[in-house]
Amino acid sequence: MKNIRNFSIIAHIDHGKSTLSDRIIQICGGLSDREMEAQVLDSMDLERERGITIKAQSVTLDFKASDGETYQLNFIDTPGHVDFSYEVSRSLAACEGALLVVDAGQGVEAQTLANCYTAMEMDLEVVPVLNKIDLPAADPERVAEEIEDIVGIDATDAVRCSAKTGVGVTDVLERLVRDIPPPQGDPDGPLQALIIDSWFDNYLGVVSLVRIKNGTMRKGDKIKVMSTGQTYNADRLGIFTPKQVDRTELKCGEVGWLVCAIKDILGAPVGDTLTSARNPAEKALPGFKKVKPQVYAGLFPVSSDDYESFRDALGKLSLNDASLFYEPESSSALGFGFRCGFLGLLHMEIIQERLEREYDLDLITTAPTVVYEVETTAKETIYVDSPSKLPPLNNIYELREPIAECHMLLPQAYLGNVITLCIEKRGVQTNMVYHGNQVALTYEIPMAEVVLDFFDRLKSTSRGYASLDYNFKRFQASDMVRVDVLINNERVDALALITHRDNSQSRGRELVEKMKDLIPRQQFDIAIQAAIGTHIIARSTVKQLRKNVLAKCYGGDISRKKKLLQKQKEGKKRMKRIGNVELPQEAFLAILHVGKDNR
């Protein structure tokens, strides 16, 4: 056990985590040069296309150190985006140490801090690594000072490497072996294994990634899931060297995969403890704290026949992504679907793409909303995650919106622009600290504004230099209203949005104008209105298509023309009474862009 090292690689987006993992795999001979490819651990097509890591991946390698000993390295490559920070904290729970990778050109950014603090809270040994020293813009001395100044860990002798060229990566491994402690645990005690991650394989059923904390797990053992009390047979187990390799046992301190022929998706939840059925452990390991979704949206299959397969797909996906929340929902405009909760807009986009790709579904998404806390006049507190569930205005005593605490790190030059943006987003400044050339800003901004497009606009006002990390702080009373959209005097529930009263006029007008461009013209006028309660705040009309009924009157009497026009008018009236309007998918997506164009 003393030769096992478990560690994660954490860093801000694009600081070179996945490339560093590639080099480590190559040096330790996990894959031959022929099988090697860039970002070998990003196995999902979506990850490769976007060049980001979405799922944490684990690998077991052997490394012969300079002291002549051979060490077993179990390491986990983690995502860098704020939306996937839950993946990071789960990966860290399986480790004793973390490599904090910092780009020697960019320096410390917001996620660097957030991930590093997560690791420190779990009492992990953090080893700083300066990456990308082959870049002409690299300034390792300045960045080492920044790490000490902002993060507060000693970085004077931080290892310098370039994951792309492979310079200094061996030094990183030597430092790892020296600084990260071996796993603790009792190899002879009763088995306790923590499920870090699971996914669904069509042939094997549920595959789980486990970290053995105490005891040993052997092939063929009877294994008990502690939360459900169900027992299974350990059919196959092994490690990833990125490839799946079968083993006969997993020893104390190791990380590996396990197949127990569990067909039920809820059979082995992430964060659960496995123990042996013969000699069970007394208590379960502390799991992970459940994360609360920040953004909710309705997902509906385009054709209602897909509802069943959509439900199965969500089940399989939620096994792989424990932060996804869903419950059935029906809408008069869109039929049956699910209300899903996500950690952020990127997460929502990724889930939608994965459902469409991996499970071949066509989906319509409604506008994302955050959760509001509503106190009714009957003094009940309810949580509303969809505008259609908001009680009528006269039943609401107080409506509170979620406030996010946003930590931003940016160069001084962009401070003015960023502050202007935060004020526009109804933000309140709570802290500002200068670190050399960098400024650390803390603002409290309503979550609804953050999830809309705050991140994109922060990046564009600061030319990509600012970085953001946010978390939910509290609920705060505020003057929010629901803007309904009426089409031919009928409310369309899927188009409603909740917004601040100050913005409601402009948002309503903008939404109505957008809808006017998107709804195809019909044989009769379509009135599109935005309303708060019964008060109409904006209207526009999609003009009817009409035939020129006077074309056949050559010259002719005015009363003849009037008669023909009158007859056409009557016909249109009748049509309008029975006609219904089909809304295209783009119309539902229009809400996503409300408030984005008026920059």
Curated annotation (Swiss-Prot):
Signal peptide: none annotated. GO terms for cellular component: plasma membrane. The keyword Disulfide bond does not apply. Its EC number is 3.6.5.n1. GO terms for biological process: positive regulation of translation. Gene3D superfamilies: 3.30.70.240, Elongation factor 4, C-terminal domain, Elongation Factor G (Translational Gtpase), domain 3, P-loop containing nucleotide triphosphate hydrolases, Translation factors. Pfam families: EFG_C, GTP_EFTU, GTP_EFTU_D2, LepA_C. Residues 2-184 form the tr-type G domain. One of its GO terms (molecular function) is guanosine tetraphosphate binding. It catalyses: GTP + H2O = GDP + phosphate + H(+). Its main location: membrane. It is found in: Cell inner membrane. It comes from the Bacteria. Required for accurate and efficient protein synthesis under certain stress conditions. May act as a fidelity factor of the translation reaction, by catalyzing a one-codon backward translocation of tRNAs on improperly translocated ribosomes. Back-translocation proceeds from a post-translocation (POST) complex to a pre-translocation (PRE) complex, thus giving elongation factor G a second chance to translocate the tRNAs correctly. Binds to ribosomes in a GTP-dependent manner. Belongs to the TRAFAC class translation factor GTPase superfamily. Classic translation factor GTPase family. LepA subfamily. This is Elongation factor 4.
